[in-house]
């Protein structure tokens, strides 16, 4: 997130702000944190795959969902989202199998930070071949969806409304930040959002802790302890819970949904140790190491797509706890 900005200038401003205006500094840092770069440089392989994916998107039914901004919680913890305007739009693409029937179920694809739905389209063909309907979503502030900022509660809010319009859903397949969104949805972890019932959840290179992400960002831009505490505290009014509560392991435990974690031990962006923590001792969670695939290559690997499809399709798959 920080690489796309002038980090040296940001660190200088934060160093001054820590002293003279810590609250303003925390709010400005939060806005920066929640603002995805408009585009990142794609590798040659990513660019070629994205071009093919964009062509495939043209064959889908493109839909826009108008949703309310939020959530917003007052000082007493009451959700005020119902009073927010419905002036944001979420773009999603609907792919239908050839033989739609009463038994056709829906799988939702969620991309990661700075991604878009086109990055997830490697899963489309195999899922359609198994007679699933597929929804490929552009998260807020990404792809063709509106908004300029995105955080976990905002994503959960938009996806909860999408579920109300298009559910029930059979499964979610999600990468990185999208996996964190999936954890929130399936657990109903944010107050006022009901659990999204699923039969399967596939998480690819998903972070285990929002606090770990916040503190890493704070160190990168130079927040001192007071400003970091204020920065962390901005989560509760948006999420109805403190930052430290957002641990994926706890959300997966509360969800109790069969879950497949795929993570590369060589991932340099989201550490593999987090996946081990998420899976450790969990009855319904299976960890599948994917060595050599890093944080982004894992998304396009044939074995990742095969494993995700098999997991979603296997109604009789048994899950055993994976030790951390």
Describe the role of every protein-language-model region.
Residues 44-98:
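N-terminal cap/lid segment of alpha/beta-hydrolase-fold proteins
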Residues 191-241:
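Hydrolase active-site cap/lid region
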Residues 149-170:
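Alpha/beta-hydrolase active-site loop
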Residues 254-256, 261-263, 267:
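Short beta-strand/loop motif that positions the catalytic acidic residue
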